Structures are given as C-alpha cells and as structure tokens.
Amino acid sequence: MLPDNEIMIREMTMDDLDTVVEIEKECFSVPWSKQGFVDALQKNDAYYIVAVADDRVVGYCGAYGVCDEADINQVAVTEAYRRGGIGEQMVRQLLDGLIKRGYLYTTLEVRKSNAAAIALYEKLGFVSEGIRKNFYEKPTEDAVIMWKR
C-alpha cells in the first residue's frame, strides 16, 4: 500500500483522458471511448476524479447527479496499483465531493461476482438493495444495485 501522501487525488481534466482510456480498456470488457469521457467532463452534473501516483494517473472514478441523487458509474485502478487502498481513497473523496455538490444519496451497480468491490462499498456505507438481471456484457452477468442514503 502506498502512503496517503504519495497519492494525489484531484479532478479529472481533458489532459488525463489518454491515460484514463488506457485504464478503462484494462479494467472493463465494454470500455468507454475517449469521446465518452469528453462528453462526461463537459456536463455540469458530472464529477470525475483521478488518482496520481509516481507522476502518472493510476485510477479514476466518477458520477453523474440528478436532483439530490448521484450515480457512480466508474471506479477503476490500474492492475499494478490495486489492493493498495487507492480505490477506497478515490471513492471516499468522490463521495465527499458529491455531498458538497448537494447530492444526498448515492447509488451504483457492481458485478455480482466482484466480491472485493462489494466489500469496499459496504465498508463505505453502501447497502445492497436489488439485482439488475443481465446488466453487464462480456460476460453477461447480473449487477448488484447498492445505495448509500
């Protein structure tokens, strides 16, 4: 695990997108395109952050807001930096930023087989509230719907 002072978490910028897209392709079977991230960053209701270690982006996460609810749609850390607490640091900071933006409730979907992510979200106060059948592709899998209220 890297010490907290060796990780910098900040808002995502357009300059981060080439690295973010590389991480996206590494982590997800149906990755977003660079244009998808450009579009997201241009929306007023979106909030995306990156984790920087060793002078490079090693993870990112983001959410969209509607009224007083936010939906976390991506959390990713490159393989070489996993299991070091970066995901938790990012999600904690994301949640803090969402609260400051007026979002009182936060939801997300996670692959049913992703026990590590589910455990992290539970640690951060999320509760499983349902299943979305066949939500994910490549491979097809159910999503666990989680909420933090």
Feature map (PLM): residue ranges:
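Positions that flank functional sites
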Residues: 39, 113, 136
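Conserved glycine-rich acetyl-CoA-binding loop
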Residues: 56, 78-92, 99-101, 105, ...
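Non-heme di-metal
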Residues: 49, 55, 76, 124, ...
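Acetyl-CoA-dependent GNAT
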Residues: 2-3, 11-80, 91-93, 97, ...
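Acyl-donor (CoA/ACP) binding surface of acyl/acetyltransferases
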Residues: 81-84, 133-135, 142, 149
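Accessory recognition modules or surfaces
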Residues: 88, 120, 141-148
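Conserved catalytic-core motifs of GNAT/GCN5-like acyltransferases
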Residues: 109, 122, 127-143
